[in-house]
């Protein structure tokens, strides 16, 4: 009984911490858009608006626009030629640059309506058509989380960087498929067999123009994957080698380099603390943090509030969980676990268990013409032979409890060992989300070629087909979202990554970077 009460207390604390952090991030995004809306509306009221073309001033068919937005990708920034672009791939609960242009009528959200009402009260009534006719003044770019950068602005360090917006909780497989079509263009094809097995639509959103349509062997790309994003790139790489995209003659040489930043290369014991069953790595405990997450995601997607999903989308649109599609009875089936991604196991957490990582890794190769570099993070140290958090204040509050718990991880004696040679002590060092051993290089079920690096100069010249890995002192989210937390470390890390991509990872000769002479 006492253990059960302690478990409930731990669940309450974990849920509260994660909810507070999520609310902080979300409210920051909303505040940014309120500021944009206020500034735009202020300009409208201070001067007479110029006449607008009919196409700009025309009222929008919101229903039709919403339907199109569900089916189509965002207007792309198209790259071509040299040097190869650097693609930053976010991790679990992450987001990219999901941009849509919207007018005041489309943004009939609570904050904009309240703002408009307040201004009419202060300045007097203004005809609605006059307000709409000035859409160029009040239009702004409604982005994922108000334009908040998952990579904390690192994408601004180079002119040729792409930040795709992939499903934040969808499976590694589905995210890899989305990533391909984001770059190459076309309608996302999740694969016939996979779609049937998991019970979702085969085809997803449409990218009428890819963000890098010339992508091929002669025009490869650099990938930087944070957390689960690293494993997404590895699965995509194998799909390219297997020519798994109909109509495209792909190969493993389409990827020039992969940098794994706190990458989930071998799974994590945190999944078991969050609620995955250690016995199989697929099922969830009846009462756990992930069950709360599951319920929240289902309700969020079922409600299907357009402006809210524009701010943040878990990526399950191909499961068609909207109330408009399934009704109230469909919600009951989803909550009871009869249908949906949580019923089929086609979501990201099973892929992040040690068992799930072994299943993925057994099909993934390290390719001889691709450069690999991995940054493994840890926020632990040894004290009298015991692994403990290396600091209290230096760990993000959302991660501190998990750092402490993961230090004390012990595999249950009644559960089969996940792989031959498994030892608990190997999995004690961690960064609050992933075990440090998991982030070094692919090592289970078999070890891939690797080399430990103390200083970046130790690995020059780089050799392809080898995982160079480095261990740095940091928690799992030090180098994302909030740049100020990392301080000078942020610039040192990303400058090193981008410089390696531009000057040390190439097959023929160093690429010519705009406004820079190759050295």
Where are these regions (language model features)?
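Glycine-rich His-Gly loop
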Residues: 89-92, 226-227, 263, 377
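Gly/Ala-rich beta-loop-alpha elbow adjacent to hydrolase catalytic centers
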Residues: 225-229, 233
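Short coil/turn segments at beta-strand junctions that form active-site/ligand-binding loops
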Residues: 83-84, 218-220, 368-370
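Active-site catalytic pocket residues across diverse enzymes, especially alpha/beta-hydrolases
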Residues: 183, 240-244
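Helical cap/lid subdomain of alpha/beta-hydrolase-fold lipid enzymes
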Residues: 2-20, 25-57, 63, 248-519
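Flexible, membrane-associating and regulatory peripheral segments of lipid-active enzymes
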Residues: 1-214, 495, 499-519
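Alpha/beta-hydrolase fold nucleophile elbow
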Residues: 212-226, 255
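Active-site signature of alpha/beta-hydrolase-fold catalytic machinery across serine-
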Residues: 234-240
């Amino acid at each position: 009984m006492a253990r059960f009460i302690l478990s409930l207390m731990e669940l309450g604390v974990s849920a509260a911490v994660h909810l507070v952090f999520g609310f902080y991030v979300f409210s920051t995004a909303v505040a940014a858009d309120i500021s944009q809306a206020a500034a735009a509306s202020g300009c409208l009221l201070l001067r007479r608006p110029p006449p607008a073309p009919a196409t700009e001033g025309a009222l929008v068919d919101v229903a039709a626009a919403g339907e199109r937005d569900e089916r189509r990708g965002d207007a792309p920034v198209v790259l071509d030629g040299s040097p190869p672009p650097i693609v930053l791939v976010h991790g679990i609960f992450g987001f990219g640059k999901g941009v849509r242009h919207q007018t005041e009528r489309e943004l009939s959200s609570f904050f904009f309506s309240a703002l408009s009402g307040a201004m009419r009260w202060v300045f007097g009534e203004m005809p609605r058509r006059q307000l709409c006719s000035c859409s160029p003044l009040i239009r702004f770019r409604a982005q994922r989380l108000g334009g908040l950068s998952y990579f904390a602005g690192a994408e601004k360090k180079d002119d040729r960087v792409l930040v795709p917006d992939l499903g934040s909780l969808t499976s590694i497989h589905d995210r890899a498929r989305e990533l391909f079509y984001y770059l190459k263009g076309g309608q996302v094809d999740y694969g016939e067999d996979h779609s049937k097995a998991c019970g979702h639509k085969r085809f997803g959103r449409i990218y009428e123009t890819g963000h890098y349509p010339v992508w091929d062997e002669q025009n490869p790309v650099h990938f930087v994957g944070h957390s689960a994003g690293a494993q997404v790139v590895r699965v995509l790489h194998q799909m390219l080698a297997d020519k798994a995209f109909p109509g495209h003659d792909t190969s493993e040489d389409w990827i020039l380099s992969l940098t794994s930043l706190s990458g989930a290369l071998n799974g994590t014991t945190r999944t078991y603390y969050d609620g995955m069953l250690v016995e199989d790595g697929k099922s969830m405990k009846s009462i756990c943090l992930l069950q709360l997450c599951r319920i929240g995601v289902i309700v969020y997607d079922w409600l299907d509030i357009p402006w809210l999903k524009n701010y943040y989308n878990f990526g399950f649109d191909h499961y068609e969980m909207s109330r408009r599609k399934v009704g109230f009875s469909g919600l009951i089936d989803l909550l009871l676990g009869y249908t949906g991604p949580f019923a089929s196991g086609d979501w990201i957490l099973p892929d992040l268990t040690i068992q799930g990582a072994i299943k993925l890794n057994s099909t993934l190769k390290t390719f001889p013409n691709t450069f690999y570099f991995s940054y493994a993070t840890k926020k632990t140290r040894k004290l009298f032979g015991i692994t403990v958090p290396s600091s209290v204040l230096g760990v993000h509050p959302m991660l501190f409890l998990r750092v402490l718990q993961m230090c004390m991880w012990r595999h249950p004696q009644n559960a089969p060992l996940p792989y031959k040679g498994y030892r608990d002590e190997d999995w004690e060092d961690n960064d609050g989300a992933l075990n440090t051993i998991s982030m070094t290089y692919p090592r289970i079920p078999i070890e891939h070629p690797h080399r430990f690096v103390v200083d970046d100069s130790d690995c020059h010249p780089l050799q392809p087909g080898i995982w160079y890995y480095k261990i740095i002192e940091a928690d799992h989210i030090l180098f994302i979202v909030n740049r100020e937390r990392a301080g000078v470390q942020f610039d040192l890390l990303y400058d090193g990554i981008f410089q390696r991509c531009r000057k040390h990872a190439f097959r023929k000769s160093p690429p010519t970077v705009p406004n820079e002479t190759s050295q």
